[in-house]
């Protein structure tokens, strides 16, 4: 039987040191569940494992992306589950460590089946946000999906933009893709 061991905590509390000890003890690599450590350029401020730490214990999903690369919890779920299939062929237990609860939840509980936004829709909504601000997009979201409009953090422009993107792309309310709330 395979076991996924999860170590979750905020940045800077010693997860890396503890994860190294645990990984050695259970003879496991470390699968990073940190949304910022995925990016090569975000070494400072993320408490990413050093080169020496990465040499001591194999780490996955660290320093792979450019800052301009799009990555989501849904994509993390796909990547991590595929990687776990391979790792469980070599290890009885695998340690997943990080501070991104959404990423950990995606692997452990699954994620809503929200479609990936096409680049043209993402660019159009982004351009509208830059030109006119958030208010017109909030109005659009209120019309397209009143349920999500009532729930979304209206000050978090990324969440608003994403919901509008999904509504435009699919012609359906964003909330119709959500299967659960956490």
Where would I find each of the regions flagged by the language model?
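Phosphate/pyrophosphate-binding catalytic cores of soluble transferases and nucleic-acid-acting enzymes
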Residues: 1-182
